[in-house]
Amino acid sequence: MEEESKSLPSKDNFSEWYNELLMTAQIMDVRYPIKGVYVWYPFGFSIRKKVYNMLRNLLDVDHQETYFPMLIPKPELLKESEHIKGFEDEVYWVTHGGLSELEVPLALRPTSETAIYPMYKLWIRSHADLPLKLYQIVNTFRYETKHTRPLIRLREITSFKEAHTAHATWDDAEKQVHEAMDLYSEFFTKLAVPFIVHKRPEWDKFPGADYTMAFDTMMPDGKSLQVGTVHHLGTKFAKTYDITYEDEKGERQYVNQTCYGISERCIAAVIGIHGDNKGLVLPPNASQTQVVIIPIIFKKDDGGVKEACQKVKELLRANDIVAVIDDADERPGAKYYKWEMKGTPFRIEIGPRDIKNNSVMLVRRDGKKESIPMDGLPETVRNKLFEFQTDLLNAARDSMLARVKACETLDEAKQQIENGWATMPWCGEKACGLEMENAVNCKLLGEAHTIKGAGKCPICGKATDRIITMARSY
């Protein structure tokens, strides 16, 4: 793989910057000969691995990981008519096995409800089997006809984490919805990705769900990116797939279900929100390497620099800080460029003067530089990593919230969504909501409990305390 050395386009041109960065930083190669299907570079995949291990650690507290087949028989996929209507024109079909036409066409999973729930029918017998909480991390396929974009809109989603739970009552399932939202909130906070949770409008909820809660973040161009969803399914799928349990009275009852998912869009959010004109800026929690140590050597006799670098690396690693030494035969400037492009949170420079002073030079990814004594170095670096993680989240959150504006007219909202999100009163009627979308040429993200207000619906004029968020979306 060739090492790129060119500079990136300005982030002000976000689309061009994003596409160039994915290749230059070796996150994802877009040159695979199928539209919307991309290849992870090893470095990009190391970020994916770190992020999804973090997600696994959160889920494994009270979920079990599993794996269901990718192929779904057509009759099973078509059982839930409302569900399949949501994406029937996006399904990939396998119609042949070798040269023989299959008696029953098989779908490549667009999502896994129709693969999982026939098995839940077999596995759930009594109230003692509940709650059942499973998840899997798999690839899914959608024949996207819109403009595809790596990590954001794909025909093969390579990293779809989907959890599926079953409960005795609707209220139990609702409690699980809130637990899932808490889990996702912790996950995105660890990624330093700010978000607002919206209850999707009725016409934009997950097909077959009672309601949908969505985690939305704002990309640098002001568009919203949906990075996670949590759905209360009620008994809709249980009735379709006959998933029942015997209660304490010996009577058969339908289970109530939830499902919730996150894809590699979470990594797109980290890249897009934090990156700069030098490359990636990774939160320490998401970076495979947290500190790179760079020896500064001026003569053939290194004056103990290499030995000092090795000592620092071992000291940091012994304290659970992921550090590496870059001892490649390159100028220090070339190494700075390389590790800045990779988004490494900190670099440590060690030269003869630092050894003499029993110190190291610590440089944060945003350029802040300070001399740090060797005494207590691991604790200092750990504190600096935490501080950087916190600063990234706070800066991103402040930037997002500063671009969410309450608007009084549709014309004002139309202007606002060019660079951010607009909020407006809404009566709650679908007809008014759709007219608002058409007038502003945007999407209604939904209602957020964190955004309060009151006013009159701009379409029908009714007084309301319901506030809707409007945005252009990926």
Swiss-Prot record:
Q: Which Pfam families match?
A: HGTP_anticodon, ProRS-C_1, tRNA-synt_2b
From the broadest rank down, the organism's phylogenetic lineage runs: Archaea, Methanobacteriati, Methanobacteriota, Stenosarchaea group, Methanomicrobia
The free-text domain remark for this protein reads:
Consists of three domains: the N-terminal catalytic domain, the anticodon-binding domain and the C-terminal extension.
Keyword annotations for this protein?
Aminoacyl-tRNA synthetase, ATP-binding, Cytoplasm, Ligase, Nucleotide-binding, Protein biosynthesis
GO MF term (any one): proline-tRNA ligase activity
Q: Gene3D superfamilies this protein is in? A: Anticodon-binding domain (3.40.50.800), Bira Bifunctional Protein, Domain 2 (3.30.930.10), C-terminal domain of ProRS (3.30.110.30)
Q: Which GO terms describe its cellular component?
A: aminoacyl-tRNA synthetase multienzyme complex; cytoplasm
- Give the family per the record: Belongs to the class-II aminoacyl-tRNA synthetase family. ProS type 3 subfamily.
Provide one Gene Ontology biological process annotation. Answer: prolyl-tRNA aminoacylation
Per the UniProt entry, what species is this protein from, by scientific name? Methanocella arvoryzae (strain DSM 22066 / NBRC 105507 / MRE50)
Name it.
Proline--tRNA ligase
The EC class name is ligase
Which chemical reaction does it catalyze? tRNA(Pro) + L-proline + ATP = L-prolyl-tRNA(Pro) + AMP + diphosphate
